[in-house]
Amino acid sequence: MGIPWGCPQFPADVQLRPYQETAIRSWFASNGRGTLKMATGSGKTITALAIAARLYETLGLQVLVVVCPYRHLVTQWARECDRFHLMPILAFESARQWQSEVTRQLYRVRSHSQRFLTVITTNATLISESFQSQLRYFPAKTLIVGDEAHNLGAPRLEASLPRHIKLRLGLSATPERYFDEGGTDALLDYFGAVLKPELTLADAIRAGALVRYTYFPVFVNLNETESRHYALLTHRIGWALQSDDREPEDLTALLMRRARLVGAASNKIAALRSVMRSRLHTSHTLFYCSDGTDTDTDEPQLSAVVRLLGSELGYRVNTYTAETSISERERLRTQFESGELQGLVAIRCLDEGVDVPAIRTAMILASSRNPRQFVQRRGRILRPHPGKERATLFDTIVLPPQLDRQTWDVERNLLKKELQRFVEFADLAENAAEARLKLLKLQQRYGLLDI
């Protein structure tokens, strides 16, 4: 007699890669705790569900709880759970829609009249009283999985994680929280240390988990208004970095303000026009926008990009944002895959696990000095898809304006880490020599030739 439906069963059509097998062995060797640090697109979800299936076979696991940062990730997890014969309760939004069902199935599991329960929830629901009141009744044989686990290092979320559940697995391409060592430590203290192997982008490409790519840095200058704001913010960031009594959130707020300014730099629209004029025949293109607005016109970058592509260039596009409903997202994905839509103009969707593997070309207009966002945005474009042999990436890089000596030193230190990531990404590209030559200009300007 086979494993009953609703209980984790490894699918016959899935073959784990060697690094996934190694990660699973590492997690079991660490007594059922640990954080998987694996490149975006390398199969963290499948690895986690494989762990659940093995725990069911060896330990009699009773409950799987998956915590995701966003609603769309709940539905993506549900799709993968279906492949493992699981029937998850999707616990998010109104408690009326899921609370009584969780209570009922939890009672059945505890009374041994039901073998297994799967619950997929969001960070927002995790901290709610309705979910917390249920968590305390989850049995000892429960596995909690934190997807995009870096988010769970925030104080309120970390405090909401159940301490009585001892089987814990964190998933993140970059578990280190940006300018928040305390949050990173709390996160790894809860889920467990980063497990071997740490799978880099290069490893994932070599293993065939991600496709190869060509990389084209596109340099953009700030206009006069943006340059003044940039210099002022950089000066304040310098003060915040030197101050002993600074609050981490003060520095983060300044860095975010400057990132939004850079992300929405008005000259990026001209750069986009220049690139796309010769690419109007292409399809499967993602335009990844900042959520900021032009400092002079106050127009959101998303609107300016849609206007340029659709009205001016006649490129068939639609928007894909956090506000797009789940059903509308599915419709857009289908139109995008078929080529009916040539492009998607998006905000944030590359940052947290949105799965649109049909992307073959991407124009990244949003700028981020957050290492996690940098890795996620570029790694997600490299997901394999039938007929997709390689990807093409146009990456807009804003050139900092002329700054005074003191501010220049701050800028140089901040830029060094960011430029290191651009260089690493260029080095892995199929056109590495060409891409590195373009970046050399920036390295020379800032005296960073040692990168």
Q: Where are each of the predicted segments found?
A:
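SF2 helicase/translocase NTPase motor core
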Residues: 1-166, 240-249, 253-257, 264, ...
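Conserved interdomain linker/interface between the two RecA-like ATPase lobes of SF2 helicase motors
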Residues: 193-281, 285
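Short, flexible/disordered intra-domain loops and linkers
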Residues: 179-185, 293-301, 402-415
